[in-house]
Amino acid sequence: MRQVPVGTRLVLALAFVLVWGSSVQGYPARRARYQWVRCKPDGIFANCIEEKGPRFDLIAEESNVGPPMTDPVLMRGFPNDFFPISDDYSGSGSGSGSGSGSGSGSGSGSGSGSGSGSGSGSGSGSGSGSGSGSGSGSLADMEWEYQPTDENNIVYFNYGPFDRMLTEQNQEQPGDFII
């Protein structure tokens, strides 16, 4: 019988231990963290700040994206850090208008009989009107997205209002030609 060198036995034993050890431990847990962007626009600039929550383990059997802001670890770490955006930003407006008009008319008539007579008349009129209106608004159309990310820190941010995004997605690209 041929003898196996000692180095080969050592390599085989090490490979067996590594394969057996990895099958016993299972797959490594995936770690994730919630990341979000908070914006306070002031005219020209968006003034956005990227914020991160604590890390947590993703369970393979469950969905990797939970409902926003329902993770107890996240809520325990940052209980007073969130605010409704519509309280800070609101707007109002007003307007008025007026108008005027005029008109004129004339008429004449004659008649005969045992006597004779004639008549004429004229008239004019004018009118005016006015109106006003007011309104208010808030940034309620901003869509907040919270999503857990894996450890590679790949994050997709969406800075625009939700209704504007829907119309922009259906826009024709410069390369699209309609004949």
Curated annotation (Swiss-Prot):
Keyword Secreted set for record: yes
Sequence ranges of the Sequence repeats: 90-91, 92-93, 94-95, 96-97, 98-99, 100-101, 102-103, 104-105, 106-107, 108-109, 110-111, 112-113, 114-115, 116-117, 118-119, 120-121, 122-123, 124-125, 126-127, 128-129, 130-131, 132-133, 134-135, 136-137
Intracellular or extracellular location(s): Cytoplasmic granule; Cytolytic granule; Secreted, Extracellular space; Golgi apparatus
Keywords: Apoptosis, Biomineralization, Disulfide bond, Glycoprotein, Golgi apparatus, Lysosome, Proteoglycan, Repeat, Secreted, Signal
Propeptide: 27-75
GO biological process, alphabetically ordered: apoptotic process; biomineral tissue development; granzyme-mediated programmed cell death signaling pathway; maintenance of granzyme B location in T cell secretory granule; maintenance of protease location in mast cell secretory granule; mast cell secretory granule organization; negative regulation of bone mineralization; negative regulation of cytokine production
Biased composition (Gly residues): 92-136
UniProt GO molecular function: collagen binding
Maturation and modification: O-glycosylated; contains chondroitin sulfate and heparan sulfate.
Disulfide cysteine pairs (residue numbers): 39-48
InterPro entries, A to Z: Serglycin
Annotated stretches, region: Disordered: 86-145
Signal peptide interval: 1-26
GO CC, one annotated term: Golgi apparatus
Top-level lineage group: Eukaryota
Region (24 X 2 AA tandem repeats of S-G): 90-137
UniProt main location, coarse: cytoplasm
Pfam families attached to this UniProt entry: Serglycin (PF04360)
Glycan attachment positions: 90, 92, 96, 98, 100, 102, 104, 106
Complexes and interactors: Binds to activated CD44 and to GZMB.
Function description: Plays a role in formation of mast cell secretory granules and mediates storage of various compounds in secretory vesicles. Required for storage of some proteases in both connective tissue and mucosal mast cells and for storage of granzyme B in T-lymphocytes. Plays a role in localizing neutrophil elastase in azurophil granules of neutrophils. Mediates processing of MMP2. Plays a role in cytotoxic cell granule-mediated apoptosis by forming a complex with granzyme B which is delivered to cells by perforin to induce apoptosis.
Family from the record: Belongs to the serglycin family.
Protein name in the entry: Serglycin
Species: Rattus norvegicus (Rat)
Taxonomic lineage: Eukaryota, Metazoa, Chordata, Craniata, Vertebrata
Gene designation: Srgn
